[in-house]
Design a protein with these regions (language model features):
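Histidine-dependent nucleotide/RNA phosphoesterase domain, centered on the 2H-phosphoesterase fold
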Residues: 303-309, 341-344
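Short, basic interhelical loop/turn and adjoining N-cap
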Residues: 321-328
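Segments forming glycine/polar-rich beta-alpha architectures that bind adenosine-containing cofactors
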Residues: 233-236, 243-258, 466-480, 664-667, ...
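Short acidic, hydrophobic short linear motifs in intrinsically disordered regions
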Residues: 307-320
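Acidic, low-complexity/disordered tracts enriched in E/D and polar residues
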Residues: 1-6, 10, 183-305, 424
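C-terminal structured domains
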Residues: 580-838, 843-860
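Type-3 copper protein
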Residues: 1-224, 329-634, 796-867
């Protein structure tokens, strides 16, 4: 097996200096809180000691004094004054008792003085942090990013320096503050994508060390519309017969005749649901529509059998042949459009051309209908207004974003949609050119890369599905067999096995080897291996190295039939660590699909951006493999927008039109074959060349249509997921998960899990509440600087981590507001690397960065299977 690291890597650079995180903290407040806690502990210790001494006097006192001494003892222990009671004691005894109590009183006085000093200083600490937070609005890049990320909040943000920089802001300013703090931490301490907060850049590795010529001081900006409103407006046309006038129709590409004369249509419908958060998200609802044999279906399929016809032409033909009125024929045809047998040609958006609405505008203009023409003009206004945002700044940018939102509202109104625009109506990407990179050199070994490949396969839940598919193939076609009807095989696999399997919930306590579904292809072995790995990483105490169990004939891998791919490319998001640190690099969690590493921002970097994919394509060709893109279905989110990065695309039934790939292969023309020596299935072209599907979008595969998900099972796992943090069992107390590594590669930071039910009640932004939070933080063993994510009991994955320093009063208050009342737990991870350890230095401006690293694992055909 050969390892080849990509020559070009992507950097995601922080949008604010790392010093910002330290500026938004108050070390003096933390020092004061710790002194208060120390003083309180000292007082408690002295009270207990004094109580023990007074107990001796109580035992030896005559009956007439015992009651008074008991009351004095209780008062001292509970922190109440007892001066009068002590003075009333007999001479001699009063002096003895006073001497016992005096150290307690001195310590209590010191504590009271310390607490009073904190109450005096606390408003200054809060105002100081808020003043520094407000000063970030003077950073043009950050402020402009907020205008796009938080549209409509401009007035509140502008008011924050005047109304929010106080000891106790009002409710509106606190809400504004929480949003501002969230984006400040995201920009300064975590290279989060998709905004002006974190521009991207390209660099290359030469002889193992990164080289970068010159980093410009300002990023290039490019704004474009969100295609979510576009897809929603165009998708709504099929629901209204009146809006079908003049539009071209075609038969669905997923129609399958049945033996009884009826038709089956695999229909994919995107459901757009408004949410309080204004998320631009849709779910792909897939179903098989079974149409019985009917005269109307026969006539329509005959009419559209030769190609596309406009709606009125099909209505006229149907009315004439079926003896229907035009009205009834139109209703019948509109119903077939809704059922999916007939589709509007050219209105579905392909990732290659969706940024220009594909062919939709041309089709709408050619329809000859006033509503269609009005919709085309609305699309023009939306695109023009969104494109203009990138060239604006300050107050003009706020007005520009407002105009974009107005354009979306007009678009929805013209399309007849009763819906609210999403929160994000314009996307802005920023890029830096090549520059001087002064980060640490890359120091990983080939053995570690190979182990990462094994881990990626082991952790990928789809590996169980790959085993199921191969088991089904061997059973239905035969071991080493070939199947020429690939779409038919995928449909049968889904109908007979996969669909039922995916709707089940596995009992984590049951023996997987006895599960009848998991016996196909011995898929149960992968489930068992994942369980064993989970047990292994949960059992470790301080640090766990997985390298020995991911190489050789380890017990964990024994019995697994690891697939051998002739060419395989993996992505990981990582931060390189300096010499002498905890390792060579830290692998970060990937939110989404790693194909975005070479697609999402490629257009911002010109020919070099496309070279990342072209280099992979050439290396795959040398290994006898052709990489071929799969579209991921109709585009409805900017997460999947990209130009044609590979030379070939596989066209599946139901794919959107608009592909710009130079070469297009119909899935119908490929062959699926079993390769027992490589323990996998492979797609093969007619000339014998292996074709490896490559989904290049960022949207997670589970959100794409089922055909894409099934086809992706014929490709290897393409990223190294680091979801090593298991759920905290319900009813459990805090627990610490060890740091996990593969040799020098850290794949999980040391993490403490704490139930939200144990969070302190007081407000940390008060002198009374903050020491309680510091005490709780220390008692729970949480690091002073950390990344915190909230996980719930709702089955959803944990949210994105947020950088937090316990000395940051405002940040802690904003975070605790998010955690309060949630049923779940916090994942508190060590801040590795420290913010000062992995930075880009630019004219005394230090920025955190994250690398999108890629590498190949290739197996020559002559080698034996890896196991």
């Amino acid at each position: 097996m050969t390892v080849t690291v990509d020559e070009i890597v992507q950097l995601r650079v922080g949008g604010l200096p790392v010093e910002t995180a330290r500026d938004l903290a108050s070390p003096g407040a933390l020092e004061w809180a710790e002194r208060v806690l120390g003083a309180r502990a000292r007082v408690a210790e002295l009270r207990e000691g004094a109580s023990d001494q007074l107990a001796g006097h109580v035992r030896g006192a005559p009956d007439g004094l015992r009651k008074e001494l008991v009351q004095i003892r209780r008062a001292v222990f509970n922190g109440r004054r007892a001066d009068r009671a002590i003075a009333a004691l007999p001479t001699g005894l009063a002096e003895v008792v006073a001497a016992v109590v005096e150290p307690v009183r001195r310590a209590e006085a010191e504590l009271a003085e310390l607490e009073a000093a904190g109450r005096t200083s606390f408003p200054d600490w809060l105002v100081g942090e808020r003043r520094r937070l407000a000063s970030l609005l003077e950073d043009e890049d950050f402020s402009d990013g907020l205008a796009v990320a938080v549209p409509g909040a401009g007035r509140s943000l502008r008011a924050y320096p005047r109304k929010g920089v106080v000891a106790v802001p009002n409710k509106q300013m606190r809400k504004c503050e929480r949003s501002l703090m969230s984006y400040a931490m995201r920009a300064a301490a975590k290279a989060s994508p998709f905004s002006t907060f974190t521009p991207t850049a390209l660099t290359s590795f030469t002889a193992g060390a990164p080289g970068w010529e010159r980093l410009p001081s300002r990023p290039r900006r490019h704004s474009r519309w969100s295609i979510y409103p576009v897809a929603r407006a165009l998708g709504g046309l099929r629901e209204d017969r009146r809006r079908l006038q003049g539009l071209p129709l075609r038969l669905s590409r997923t129609v399958q005749p049945r033996s009884d004369g009826g038709l089956d249509v695999v229909r994919s419908v995107y459901e757009y649901k408004d949410s309080d958060r204004g998320e631009d998200y849709a779910t792909c609802e897939q179903s098989v529509v079974r149409l019985r044999q009917s005269e109307v279906c026969r006539i329509v399929t005959d009419l559209l059998g030769e190609g596309t016809l406009v709606f009125e032409t099909v209505v006229a033909g149907l009315a004439e042949r079926a003896g229907l009125t035009r009205e009834r024929a139109g209703e019948a045809l509109a119903r077939l459009v809704r059922l999916g047998l007939v589709e509007v040609d050219g209105l579905d958006l392909h990732p290659h051309t969706a940024h220009r609405a594909g062919t939709a505008r041309r089709i709408l203009c050619a329809a000859g209908d006033d509503d269609a023409a009005g919709l085309a003009r609305a699309l023009d206004r939306y695109e023009e207004s969104a494109s203009a945002v990138g060239g604006t700044t300050g107050a003009e940018r706020e007005r520009a974003v407002a105009r974009v939102r107005d354009a979306v509202e007009d678009l929805y109104e013209i399309a007849g949609l009763q819906a609210r625009p999403p929160r994000t109506v314009v996307y802005e990407d920023c890029a830096l050119g090549r520059g001087v990179y002064r980060g640490p050199a890359l120091r990983w070994s080939e053995e570690e890369c190979r182990a990462l490949g094994v881990l990626a396969t082991l952790l990928d839940p789809a590996q169980t599905d790959r085993a199921l598919m191969r088991g089904y193939f061997v059973q239905s076609v035969g071991e080493g067999g070939r199947c020429a009807d690939v779409p038919g095989f995928l449909r049968s696999f889904d109908a007979d096995l996969y669909d039922s399997h995916k709707t089940r919930t596995l009992d984590p306590r049951a023996a997987t080897s006895e599960d009848p579904w998991l016996r196909w292809g011995e898929a149960w072995r992968w489930e068992e291996a994942r369980r064993a790995l989970t047990s292994l990483i949960e059992a470790g105490e301080d640090e766990l190295d997985l390298l020995p169990v991911l190489t050789g004939d380890s017990e964990l891998l024994r019995g697994l039939d690891l697939p051998r791919y002739r060419y395989r490319h993996l992505f990981l998001f990582a931060q390189v660590l300096p010499e002498g640190s905890a390792g060579s690099l830290v692998v970060n969690r990937i939110f989404g699909h790693a194909g975005f590493g070479l697609s999402r921002f490629a257009y911002m970097h010109g020919p070099e951006g496309a070279r990342v994919a072209r280099d992979q394509e050439e290396r795959a060709r040398l290994s006898g493999v052709r990489l071929a893109e799969v579209s991921g279905g109709a585009a409805f989110t900017n997460l999947n927008l990209h130009g044609p990065l590979l030379g070939t695309e596989i066209i599946q039934p139901g794919d959107p039109g608009g592909s710009s790939a130079p070469t297009r292969m119909d899935l119908d023309g490929l062959v699926l074959e079993d390769r027992p020596g490589e323990s996998r299935l492979a797609l093969v072209a007619p000339d014998g060349e292996e074709v490896q599907p490559a989904y290049l979008g960022y949207l997670v595969l589970s959100a794409t249509p089922l055909p894409t998900q099934l086809l992706a099972l014929l490709a290897p796992a393409s990223n190294v997921t680091t979801s090593f943090v298991p759920d905290l069992p319900e009813g459990s107390g805090p627990r610490t998960l060890p740091r996990v590594r593969i040799g020098s590669l850290v794949v999980r930071r040391r993490t403490v899990q704490v139930p939200t039910a144990l969070l302190p009640e007081p407000d940390p932004a008060t002198p009374e509440g903050y020491p309680e939070w510091v005490r709780w933080w220390r008692d729970a063993g949480l690091p002073e600087r950390c990344y915190v994510s909230l996980a719930g009991r709702d089955g959803m994955p944990p949210g994105k981590p947020r950088y937090l320093e316990v000395s940051g009063l405002v940040n802690l208050a904003a975070s605790s507001h998010e955690w309060r009342g949630q049923d779940g737990w916090l994942n508190v991870s060590e801040a590795l690397p420290d913010l000062s350890e992995t930075v880009i230095n630019r004219e005394d401006d230090h920025r955190i960065h994250e690398m999108v690293l890629g590498f190949d694992l290739t197996n020559p055909v002559t080698e034996g299977a890896v196991s």
